[in-house]
C-alpha cells in the first residue's frame, strides 16, 4: 500500500486483525452519482440514455394540438456554462445553475379533408431556453440563493404488490382479514381485501369498496370464466349404487371424511369415517391403485355447479354456474337425464368458496353494468354512459400516461407473483390482476406468507436525481396544458417553437423544489462530519412519505435487513427516532433504488477475491458468515461449524455451505458510528448519543487528531472535501496562506493547462456560523501524488478528521463540582486556548428606495458623536480589523422620514437657517447585544447604473489584483513549460533560417538561445520537418492557452465591474462579517465520543487541580459515577489506551533528543519498530522521514482501533507496559490545594473531548425593556426577539402560595401588559416617587373582545349605574 504525503508524516498504529479487502466507496457518491444520472450533462455519441431529464422530456413530448394538425417534438437538450461559479454565487446570494437549452421541432401537417390523410407541410427547429437548472458542487451540495443546501434521500415503500393482514384488529372475533395492495410509482392504487364474511372486495384509490367480481367482469370475464380461473372442477358420474368420482390423493390429504371412503371398483371400504387421511396414507392408497371412489347423493349436496345446465329440449336454464346443488335440484337433474355433473372443486379445507360467494353477492352480471358501477364509485354524481365508463376504466390502470408501475414496480411484481414480463411493460395487465387475486385467496386458504413491509427489499431510496425528475415532470405537465391551448389559438404556420413555450412553470417547479421542499435542507455545516452525515441521510418523511404522528413502532425499529445497509445506531433522539437514518459505511444504492451491501464470495469453503453487492431480496437466499471468521493461510474457512445469517436467522453450518463472508466489521455502522473507538464496549443508547454529538463539535483554532482513533478519520477528511486533495500529480511551485500553485507533471495535455491553482478558503462563514479556514501542508518543491492532502481544512489535522482535542482526564469526584455529569476543567485549557473556537457572524444592511426618497449609506448620521463613528471610513462602512462591541455602528444609514406639518414660525426659521437634519432618521446597522469581535470582511453590492463609493472601488481593485496574480502565475508556469519544451526541440538541430545573427545550416546551441528573447525563439526555422511541425503545434497550443487564460480573466473582471443583481427596490447592500472568539467557559457543553456529555461547572486554577507524581496537573476531572449506569465502558478503555499512547510519545521524545545529541538513529529506529511492529509504511521510511515522523509523535503515538475489531484488553496492557506505565492504568494523584496524595489510585489518561455547538454565549440573555406583542401587549419571548421571561401559571401558584400579593400584581400588570400602568410607573420612577397604581391588563380586554365576537356582551357595571 503506497502511503500518501501526509500519511508518512504521522503513521497510525493499527490494531485491526481483519485485513480490509474492499475499498470503501466514496462517501458522497450517493448524491453525486444520482444527480449526474439525472442531468447526463455530456451527451455521449450514441445519444443519452432513457433516464433522468431525457426520460422526462421523452415522456411529455411530443405534444399535439387538439385537432392533431401540428406536433411539437423534443430533439435534445444541452447545458450552457453557468454564468457565475460557486464562490461568486455564494458571495452574491445567487443560485449556482446552468441555463438549459432545449431543441424543439414543430411539425405542421396538411390534412386532406376528404380522406383524412396527413402530409407534412412544414418543419421548424429551434433552441428554446427552458430556465436554469441548479448544478451540484464538487462536494454534493447545491448553492441556492447563496446558501449551501443538501437534498436528503427519501426512503419510501417500493412500487409493486404487497400482501398483508390486519393482525385480527378489525373484527371482534380476532379473525385475520387478508388484503393485497398494488402500488404504482404514479397512478391509482388498487386494493383487494376480505371482509369478516370472507367476501373479496376491491377498492380503487381507497374509495368505496366493490365486490372483486365487478372488477373481473370489467376485465371482460363472464361468471363461468371467473369460476374456471379460480377453481378446478370435479365430475360426478351416475352409476347404479350411487355416483363415481375420481380419487385425488392431494385433495384428501389431511381431511377427515364424514362417511366411509369406498373403492368404486371393488366396493371395499378403504378409509373409515372420521379417520384422518394422513399424507402417507393418501400416497399409499394412490400407489395401491385406488382410481375412483363411490359416493352417495348426500356427498353431492352443498357442492356448486361449475357450468350452467340447460334443458336441451326447451332451452330453459336449469341452473346457473356457481349454484348450490340442493337435493331437489339433484333429483330434477337426474330425472332430466343428466348423468355427468361437473362441480367446483371446493372442499372448504384446502380451497374456500370465497370467489364463488362473492359472485353470488355481486349485483352485476355483465361487463356494462360492472363498468358503470366502477364509474359511479370513481365519479359520484356524474351520469355514466357506456363510452365514458369504458374510457375511465381504461385510463385507470392500462394507460401509460396515467399509470406507471416503473421498472422497479414491474420487477417486484414479477418476483412476488412468479411472472416473467419485461420491465418495459409498466401498466397493469389482466393477468397481473388475476395473479394478485389468486395469491390473496391462496393466503386465505393458508398457502404462502404475507409480506414484511419494513424489509429493505420492500423499501427503496429516492435520491436527488429521482426526486428532481418527478418535480420537473410536474412542471412540464403544467407547461403542456398551456402549449396545447396556445397551439390551437395561434396561426400555426407563422409561429416558431419559441412562441409556443412559456418555461415559467418548469422553472417554478425547480425553484419550489430546491427552495421549499421538505427534503431540501439547509446544510449542517458545523464540521466536516456533519456535512458528510447530512448527505448520507435517509429520511422516511417528506412528500409521499410517512408523517411523524402516523409512523408506528415497526417502521422505526431496527430490521434484520438493515445489516450492512442502514446504521442501527445513528438516528435522532426524539420524535424522529427511526424515521431518519444514515447509510452504512460500505452501502450503495443500486439502479432500482434498493440499498446493497458488499460481501466476499466463498467457493467450496475457500474465500474468493471477488466482491459482490447484494440487495436485501437477493441476500435472503444465501448463508453469510461474519467478517471475523477464522481464515487459514490459503484463504480457507477454519473450524467444524461456522455461524451464519440466512434470511434474518442464525444457523451453524459447515464451511463448505457458506456462500459469502462480510467484507468488514464496520460495514454494519454509519460513518459517524465508525469514528467511535471501542464502540463494541458501549451501550447502544450512548453510542447513539456519541455519534450524534460528534456532528455538533465546533471546529477549534488548533485542531488535533485523536490519539485513539478508528482509522476512519482520514477517509472522512478526504471525502468531505474539507481537506484539499491534489487534482493531479505534480510539484509544488508556490505556497502562501491563501493559495497553492502546483505544476502538473502527469496528465498534461493541450486542452488543460499545466497548472493547478488551489485558492484556500480563509476565515469564511459556514451555515452554522462556524469558521471555515484552510491551511497549506506542503512546501515549495514538494512532490505530491494525485489525491494527496495538500491543505487542511476546518477540523482536520494532517489529513485526519480532528473534531476535538486530546486532554488529560482523571475520573474522581472533586468537591461536588462534577455532580450530575458536570465537568471540572483546569485554567490551563482556557489560558492555552485549547478549546477556543472562532465563530463568524454575518450582518447585512440594505439601502432601499422608499416613497419619501432613497435611503443613504453614509458617515453623516444625525445626533451621533464622533466617538461612535471612529471605526467608520468616509463611506460610512466599518474598517476591516476594527474591534467592535455591542451597540457599535457597523454601517451608517439614514432614512428620510415623513414631514410633519410645520407652524409658520418653524417655516420661517427653516427658510432662514436651512435646517435639514430633522427630516432623516438614523437606521444604522448596529452590533446586536452579546456579540463582540473583529471585523474580518466587508462586501459592498451596488445596483446597475449606480456609482460605486470609494470603499466598493477599493474592494474591487483588491479582487482584480488577486485575479491578475493568478493569471500571471499561470502564464509564468506555462511559459516555463512551453519554453523548456521548445529549447529541448531546438537544441542541436540544424537551422533553416532564423533571426539576425543566426547562420543557416549551423546547429542551435544554448548560447544562441540565451542571446535571443523568448519571443524570437519562434522565428527559428529548422531543416528537420518533424521537429518543425512539433514547434508549430507547440506554438498553436501556447497561443490557445494564453488566449483562454486572458478570456477567463477578462470575463471575471467584467463580472466584478458590472453592477450586482439586487432584490427589487434595493439600491445598495453592505455585508459585514465579524469574527467572534469564543473561549471555553462555565456553562459550555462538552462531550466525549461515547455519549458522555456534560456542562462545565467550574474552571479551577491550575495549581488547585489534582496533579501526577511528576507535578503535571490534570486538565479535566470527570465523575466516575457517570460510567457504570450508562454502560459506556468504551471511554475507560480509551482513557487507558490514550495514557499508553502519550507514554510512548514521551519515550519517543527522549529517544529523539538522544538522536539530536549523538546522531545515532539505532535507538530511535528500534523504539519505533517496537511500537509499530512490521508496519510496511514505517519500514519504508528513510532516516530523514523517520526523524520528521518521530517529531510528530512526541505528543503521543496515534493508534487506530477499528469498530468491532479493535484492541483487546491484553493489547492495551501490553501498550501500557511498553510505555513503562502501571498495567492497571491507574496512578497516585495529589490534591492540588494540600499536596497530599489521595487515598487510593485514580484512573488517569487521555480522552478525546469535543466542544459542542451549545455555547452559553449564544443562550444567555437579559432584557430590561423591549418589544411587546401587538395584540396582547405582553413582552415577546426568546432571545432572538429580545424577549422577556414568561411568568406562567405555575409561577403564579408559587407567588400565591407565599401570599406575595403585590409582587403578583406587578407581575401580571405593570411588568407585563398593563399599557397605562407601564407609563405611570416610568413617570413615577422619573419623579423619584415609589407609588403607582395598576390598571387593567390588556389581555383582559382581549378576552372581552373575544367573548363579544362570540356574541356574549361583557360589561363592567359600576355601583353608580345600579
UniProtKB/Swiss-Prot annotation:
CDD domains: RNA_pol_B_RPB2 (cd00653). GO terms for cellular component: DNA-directed RNA polymerase complex. Gene3D superfamilies: 2.40.50.100, 2.40.50.150, 3.90.1100.10, DNA-directed RNA polymerase, beta subunit, external 1 domain, DNA-directed RNA polymerase, subunit 2, domain 6, RNA polymerase alpha subunit dimerisation domain, RNA polymerase Rpb2, domain 2. The keyword Amino-acid biosynthesis does not apply. Keywords: DNA-directed RNA polymerase, Nucleotidyltransferase, Transcription, Transferase. Its EC number is 2.7.7.6. It comes from the Bacteria. One of its GO terms (biological process) is DNA-templated transcription. GO terms for molecular function: DNA binding; DNA-directed RNA polymerase activity; ribonucleoside binding. InterPro entries: DNA-dir_RNA_pol_bsu_ext_1_sf, DNA-dir_RNA_pol_bsu_external_1, DNA-dir_RNA_pol_su2, DNA-dir_RNAP_su2_dom, DNA-dir_RNAP_su2_hyb_sf, RNA_pol_bsu_bac, RNA_pol_bsu_CS, RNA_pol_bsu_protrusion. The RNAP catalytic core consists of 2 alpha, 1 beta, 1 beta' and 1 omega subunit. When a sigma factor is associated with the core the holoenzyme is formed, which can initiate transcription. Belongs to the RNA polymerase beta chain family. DNA-dependent RNA polymerase catalyzes the transcription of DNA into RNA using the four ribonucleoside triphosphates as substrates. This is DNA-directed RNA polymerase subunit beta. It comes from Parvibaculum lavamentivorans (strain DS-1 / DSM 13023 / NCIMB 13966).
Amino acid at each position: 500500500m503506497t502511503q500518501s504525503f501526509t500519511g508518512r508524516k504521522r503513521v497510525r498504529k493499527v490494531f485491526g486483525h481483519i485485513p480490509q479487502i474492499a475499498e470503501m466507496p466514496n462517501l458522497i457518491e450517493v448524491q453525486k452519482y444520482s444527480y449526474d444520472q439525472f442531468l447526463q450533462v455530456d451527451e455521449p455519441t450514441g445519444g443519452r440514455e432513457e433516464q433522468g431529464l431525457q426520460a422526462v422530456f421523452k415522456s411529455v413530448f411530443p405534444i399535439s394540438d387538439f385537432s392533431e394538425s401540428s406536433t411539437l417534438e423534443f430533439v435534445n437538450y444541452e447545458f450552457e456554462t453557468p454564468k457565475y461559479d460557486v464562490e461568486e454565487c455564494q458571495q452574491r446570494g445567487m443560485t449556482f445553475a446552468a441555463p438549459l437549452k432545449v431543441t424543439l421541432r414543430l411539425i405542421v401537417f396538411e390534412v386532406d379533408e376528404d380522406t383524412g390523410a396527413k402530409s407534412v407541410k412544414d418543419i421548424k427547429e429551434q433552441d428554446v431556453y427552458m430556465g436554469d437548472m441548479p448544478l451540484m458542487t464538487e462536494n454534493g451540495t447545491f448553492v441556492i440563493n447563496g446558501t449551501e443546501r443538501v437534498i436528503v434521500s427519501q426512503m419510501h415503500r417500493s412500487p409493486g404488490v404487497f400482501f398483508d393482514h390486519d393482525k385480527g384488529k378489525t373484527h371482534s372475533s380476532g379473525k385475520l382479514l387478508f388484503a393485497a395492495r398494488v402500488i404504482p410509482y404514479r397512478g391509482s392504487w388498487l386494493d383487494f381485501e376480505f371482509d369478516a364474511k370472507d367476501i373479496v372486495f376491491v377498492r380503487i384509490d381507497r374509495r368505496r369498496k366493490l365486490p372483486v367480481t365487478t372488477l373481473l367482469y370489467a376485465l371482460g370475464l363472464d361468471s363461468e370464466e371467473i369460476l374456471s380461473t379460480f377453481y378446478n372442477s370435479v365430475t360426478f358420474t351416475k352409476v347404479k349404487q350411487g355416483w363415481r368420482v375420481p380419487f385425488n390423493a392431494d385433495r384428501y390429504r389431511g381431511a377427515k371424511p364424514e362417511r366411509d371412503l369406498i373403492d368404486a371398483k371393488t366396493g371395499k371400504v378403504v378409509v373409515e369415517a372420521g379417520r384422518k387421511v394422513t399424507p402417507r396414507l393418501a400416497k399409499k392408497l394412490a400407489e395401491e391403485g385406488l382410481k375412483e371412489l363411490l359416493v352417495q347423493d348426500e356427498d353431492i349436496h352443498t357442492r356448486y355447479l361449475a357450468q350452467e345446465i340447460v334443458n336441451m329440449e326447451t332451452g330453459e336454464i336449469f341452473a346457473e354456474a356457481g349454484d348450490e346443488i340442493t337435493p331437489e335440484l339433484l333429483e330434477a337433474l337426474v330425472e332430466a337425464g343428466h348423468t355427468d355433473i361437473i362441480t367446483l372443486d371446493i372442499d372448504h379445507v384446502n380451497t374456500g368458496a370465497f370467489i364463488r360467494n362473492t359472485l353470488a353477492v355481486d349485483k352485476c352480471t355483465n361487463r356494462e353494468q360492472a363498468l358503470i358501477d366502477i364509474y359511479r364509485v370513481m365519479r359520484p354524481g356524474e351520469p355514466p354512459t357506456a363510452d365514458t365508463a369504458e374510457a375511465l376504466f381504461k385510463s385507470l390502470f392500462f394507460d401509460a400516461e396515467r399509470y406507471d408501475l416503473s421498472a422497479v414496480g414491474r420487477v417486484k411484481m414479477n418476483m412476488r407473483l412468479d411472472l416473467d414480463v419485461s420491465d418495459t411493460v409498466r401498466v397493469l395487465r389482466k393477468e397481473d390482476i388475476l395473479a394478485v387475486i389468486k395469491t390473496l385467496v391462496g393466503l386465505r386458504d393458508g398457502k404462502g406468507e404475507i409480506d414484511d413491509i419494513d424489509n429493505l427489499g420492500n423499501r427503496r431510496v429516492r435520491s436527488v436525481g429521482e426526486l428532481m425528475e418527478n418535480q420537473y415532470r410536474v412542471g412540464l405537465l403544467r407547461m403542456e396544458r398551456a402549449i396545447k391551448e396556445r397551439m390551437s389559438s395561434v396561426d400555426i404556420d407563422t409561429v416558431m417553437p419559441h412562441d409556443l413555450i412559456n418555461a415559467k412553470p418548469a422553472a417554478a417547479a425547480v425553484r419550489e423544489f430546491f427552495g421549499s421542499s421538505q427534503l431540501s435542507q439547509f446544510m449542517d455545516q458545523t464540521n466536516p462530519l456533519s456535512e458528510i452525515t447530512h448527505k448520507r441521510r435517509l429520511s422516511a418523511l417528506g412528500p409521499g412519505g410517512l408523517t411523524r404522528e402516523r409512523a408506528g413502532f415497526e417502521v422505526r425499529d431496527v430490521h434484520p435487513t438493515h445489516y450492512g445497509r442502514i446504521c442501527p445506531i445513528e438516528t435522532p433522539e426524539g420524535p424522529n427516532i427511526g424515521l431518519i437514518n444514515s447509510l452504512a459505511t460500505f452501502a450503495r444504492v443500486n439502479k432500482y433504488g434498493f440499498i446493497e451491501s458488499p460481501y466476499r464470495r466463498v467457493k467450496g469453503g475457500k474465500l474468493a477475491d471477488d466482491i459482490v453487492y447484494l440487495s436485501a431480496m437477493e441476500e435472503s437466499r444465501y448463508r453469510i458468515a461474519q467478517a471475523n471468521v477464522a481464515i487459514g493461510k490459503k484463504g480457507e474457512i477454519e473450524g467444524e461449524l461456522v455461524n451464519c445469517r440466512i434470511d434474518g436467522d442464525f444457523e451453524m453450518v459447515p464451511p463448505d455451505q457458506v456462500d459469502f463472508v462480510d467484507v468488514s466489521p464496520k460495514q454494519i455502522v454509519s460513518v459517524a458510528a465508525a469514528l467511535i473507538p471501542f464502540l463494541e464496549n458501549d451501550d447502544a443508547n450512548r453510542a447513539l448519543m456519541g455519534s450524534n454529538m460528534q456532528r455538533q463539535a465546533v471546529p477549534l483554532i488548533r485542531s488535533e487528531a485523536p490519539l485513539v482513533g478508528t482509522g476512519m478519520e482520514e477517509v472522512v477528511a478526504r471525502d468531505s472535501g474539507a481537506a484539499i486533495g491534489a487534482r493531479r500529480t505534480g510539484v509544488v511551485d508556490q505556497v502562501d496562506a491563501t493559495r497553492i500553485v502546483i505544476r502538473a507533471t502527469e496528465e498534461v495535455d493541450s486542452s488543460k493547462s499545466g497548472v493547478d491553482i488551489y485558492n484556500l478558503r480563509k476565515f469564511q462563514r459556514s451555515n452554522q456560523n462556524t469558521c471555515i479556514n484552510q491551511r497549506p501542508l506542503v512546501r515549495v518543491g514538494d512532490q505530491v501524488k494525485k489525491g494527496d492532502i495538500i491543505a487542511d481544512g476546518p477540523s482536520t489535522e494532517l489529513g485526519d478528521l480532528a473534531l476535538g482535542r486530546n486532554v488529560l482526564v482523571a475520573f474522581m469526584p472533586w468537591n461536588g463540582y462534577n455532580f450530575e455529569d458536570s465537568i471540572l476543567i483546569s485554567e490551563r485549557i482556557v489560558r492555552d486556548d485549547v478549546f477556543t473556537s472562532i465563530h463568524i457572524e454575518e450582518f447585512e444592511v440594505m439601502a432601499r428606495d422608499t416613497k419619501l426618497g432613497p435611503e443613504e449609506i453614509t458617515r453623516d448620521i444625525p445626533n451621533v458623536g464622533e466617538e461612535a463613528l471612529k471605526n467608520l471610513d468616509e463611506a460610512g462602512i466599518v474598517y476591516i480589523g476594527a474591534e467592535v462591541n455591542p451597540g457599535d455602528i457597523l454601517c451608517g444609514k439614514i432614512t428620510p422620514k415623513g414631514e410633519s406639518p410645520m407652524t409658520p414660525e418653524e417655516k420661517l426659521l427653516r427658510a432662514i437657517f436651512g435646517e435639514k437634519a430633522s427630516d432623516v432618521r438614523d437606521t444604522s446597522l448596529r452590533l446586536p447585544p452579546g456579540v463582540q469581535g473583529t471585523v474580518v470582511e466587508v462586501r459592498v453590492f451596488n445596483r446597475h447604473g449606480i456609482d460605486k463609493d470609494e470603499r466598493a472601488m477599493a474592494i474591487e481593485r483588491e479582487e482584480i489584483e488577486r485575479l491578475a496574480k493568478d493569471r500571471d502565475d499561470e502564464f509564468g508556469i506555462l511559459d516555463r513549460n512551453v519554453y523548456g519544451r521548445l529549447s529541448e526541440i531546438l537544441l542541436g538541430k540544424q537551422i533553416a533560417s532564423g533571426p539576425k545573427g543566426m547562420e543557416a545550416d549551423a546547429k542551435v546551441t544554448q548560447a544562441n538561445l540565451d542571446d535571443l528573447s523568448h519571443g524570437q525563439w519562434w522565428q527559428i526555422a529548422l531543416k528537420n520537418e518533424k521537429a518543425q511541425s512539433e514547434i508549430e503545434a507547440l506554438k498553436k497550443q501556447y497561443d490557445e492557452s494564453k488566449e483562454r487564460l486572458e478570456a477567463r480573466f477578462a470575463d471575471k473582471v467584467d463580472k466584478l465591474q458590472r453592477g450586482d443583481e439586487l432584490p427589487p427596490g434595493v439600491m445598495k447592500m453592505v455585508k459585514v462579517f465579524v469574527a467572534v472568539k469564543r473561549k471555553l467557559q462555565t456553562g459550555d457543553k462538552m462531550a466525549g465520543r461515547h455519549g458522555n456529555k456534560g456542562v462545565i461547572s467550574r474552571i479551577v486554577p491550575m495549581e488547585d487541580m489534582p496533579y501526577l507524581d511528576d507535578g503535571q496537573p490534570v486538565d479535566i476531572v470527570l465523575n466516575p459515577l457517570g460510567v457504570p449506569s450508562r454502560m459506556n465502558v468504551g471511554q475507560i478503555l480509551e482513557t487507558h489506551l490514550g495514557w499508553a499512547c502519550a507514554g510512548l510519545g514521551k519515550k519517543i521524545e527522549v529517544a529523539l533528543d538522544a538522536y539530536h545529541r549523538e546522531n545515532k538513529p539505532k535507538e530511535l529506529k528500534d523504539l519505533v519498530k517496537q511500537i509499530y511492529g512490521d508496519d510496511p509504511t514505517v519500514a519504508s521510511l528513510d532516516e530523514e522521514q523517520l526523524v520528521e515522523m518521530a517529531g510528530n509523535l512526541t505528543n503521543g503515538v496515534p493508534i487506530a482501533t477499528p469498530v468491532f475489531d479493535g484492541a483487546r484488553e491484553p493489547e492495551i496492557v501490553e501498550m501500557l507496559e511498553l510505555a513503562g506505565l502501571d498495567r492497571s492504568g491507574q496512578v497516585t494523584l495529589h490534591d492540588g490545594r494540600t499536596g497530599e496524595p489521595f487515598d487510593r489510585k485514580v484512573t488517569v489518561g487521555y480522552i478525546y473531548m469535543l466542544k459542542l455547538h451549545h455555547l452559553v454565549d449564544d443562550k444567555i440573555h437579559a432584557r430590561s425593556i423591549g418589544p411587546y406583542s401587538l395584540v396582547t401587549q405582553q413582552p415577546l419571548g426568546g432571545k432572538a426577539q429580545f424577549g422577556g421571561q414568561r411568568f406562567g401559571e405555575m409561577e403564579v401558584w408559587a407567588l400565591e402560595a407565599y401570599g406575595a400579593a403585590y409582587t403578583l400584581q406587578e407581575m401580571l400588570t405593570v411588568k407585563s401588559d398593563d399599557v397605562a400602568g407601564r407609563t405611570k410607573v416610568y413617570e413615577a420612577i422619573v419623579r423619584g416617587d415609589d407609588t403607582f397604581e395598576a390598571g387593567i391588563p390588556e389581555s383582559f380586554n382581549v378576552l372581552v373582545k373575544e367573548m363579544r365576537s362570540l356574541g356574549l356582551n361583557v360589561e363592567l357595571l359600576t355601583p353608580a349605574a345600579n
